[in-house]
From Swiss-Prot:
Function: Component of the proteasome core, a large protease complex with broad specificity involved in protein degradation.
GO molecular function: endopeptidase activity; threonine-type endopeptidase activity
InterPro entries registered for this protein in UniProt: Ntn_hydrolases_N, Pept_T1A_Psome_bsu_arc, Pept_T1A_subB, Proteasome_bsu_CS, Proteasome_sua/b, Proteasome_suB-type
GO CC terms, sorted: cytosol; proteasome core complex, beta-subunit complex
Catalytic reaction equation(s): Cleavage of peptide bonds with very broad specificity
Record's protein name: Proteasome subunit beta
Species for this entry: Methanosarcina acetivorans (strain ATCC 35395 / DSM 2834 / JCM 12185 / C2A)
Keyword Protease recorded: yes
Amino acid sequence: MDDDKYLKGTTTVGVVCTDGIVLASEQRATMGHFIASKTAKKVYQIDDLVGMTTAGSVGDAQQLVRLVSVESQLYKMRRNESMTIKGIATLMSNFLNANRYYPMMVQLLIGGVDKNGPAIYSLDAMGGSIEETRISATGSGSPMAYGVLEDQYKEDIAVKEGLDLAIRAIHNAMKRDSASGENIDVVVITKEAFKRLDPEEVKSRRDSLN
């Protein structure tokens, strides 16, 4: 499989912090060289304290969001407790692997906070699942994003600093990757809440980094 077929047009990042996680993406969607959308959603809420970023086919990604959201809610209704981050990642991994001969053209980050603390898992189109203990990036702009993440990540980073790191990584990727652009969507998940940052706050933080 040619990775370029499903990594085009996206940069998403995940940062594991001491008090939660940060998920972020830019909002450009492309069809070849055509900019199809400037407000594409690539960070989704799939449970109270769990989010997922998507890189790749929009249709495949939206189907997977619906699937995992429903399964997560059904689990909660049956067990009277939320599924763990690892459990959700395993569920998604199994589904992707079962469809490996007709693969979903996606690359995902699933992250949040559960009874075991903050965690992020990265998944490929074949269902391979890796727990990311620090940082992760997906999509065509990920090499540029990793340059910032690897250079500036600290083991004791808090969400407040993780926010700026994620924004800086996406911003840096947008400078060099023509398929990534427009605004930046940022989600912060702590043990208290799932919070999507207001666009004005993101813009203010982004401007202060220049």
